């Protein structure tokens, strides 16, 4: 028996209003799926290149040379492993044999990026990490955070970082 009061109650249930199961609105389900998609893409923005048959000092020198050969000036070199050792939070076990971050910027690229969108100033300076892990100090890793390719400036930044890392890896393997 279908009463008028029951019909009104059924119409007020969100699964009836929005046509989705379990009372979840379509908006909520779309929002949840977009959140999951954006979270997984955040984890994939680090690019790592491994270099074998070299040593940290040679790879460091190769990275400096690769940056300077692009006509760029290094802003700073951050001794990341040393900073972690000094602050020794937790059990004190460090994952790095050696680790540093080299920061640099291209004035032309920075100008292009901020013309595209003022908030893109957060992409400067660019940085490349150079490190070894405790369990394998003979393998040097070069890593950077990809700026993505959503604008022409970001594409140029990505291309610049790729060129620098590839050139640094080549120089490190040469042990020049």
Which ranges hold each PLM region?
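N-terminal secretory signal peptides that target proteins for export/translocation
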Residues: 1-24
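Sec-dependent N-terminal signal peptides
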Residues: 29-35
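N-terminal signal peptide c-region/cleavage motif recognized by signal peptidases
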Residues: 38-40
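Terminal, regulation- and interaction-focused segments at domain boundaries
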Residues: 42-71, 76-78, 170, 174
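Short, ordered beta-strand-loop transition motifs
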Residues: 43, 78, 95-96, 133-136
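Compact, glycine-rich, soluble single-domain proteins
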Residues: 79-123
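Surface-exposed, polar helix/loop patches in the mature regions of secreted/periplasmic/lumenal proteins
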Residues: 105-156
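C-terminal partner/receptor-binding element of secreted or periplasmic proteins
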Residues: 142-176
């Amino acid at each position: 028996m279908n009463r008028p009061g029951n019909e009104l109650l059924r119409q007020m249930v969100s699964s009836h209003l929005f046509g989705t199961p379990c009372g979840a609105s379509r908006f909520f389900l779309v929002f949840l799926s977009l959140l999951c998609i954006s979270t997984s893409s955040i984890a994939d923005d680090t690019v790592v290149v491994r270099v074998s048959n070299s040593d940290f000092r040679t790879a460091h020198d190769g990275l400096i040379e690769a940056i300077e050969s692009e006509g760029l000036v290094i802003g700073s070199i951050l001794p990341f492993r040393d900073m972690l050792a000094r602050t020794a939070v937790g059990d004190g076990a460090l994952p790095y044999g050696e680790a540093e971050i080299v920061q640099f910027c291209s004035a032309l690229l920075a100008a292009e990026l901020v013309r595209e969108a003022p908030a893109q100033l957060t992409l400067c300076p660019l940085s490349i990490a150079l490190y070894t892990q405790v369990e394998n100090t003979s393998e040097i890793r070069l890593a950077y955070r990809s700026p993505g390719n959503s604008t022409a400036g970001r594409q140029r930044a990505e291309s610049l970082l790729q060129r620098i890392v590839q050139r640094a890896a080549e120089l490190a393997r040469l042990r020049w």
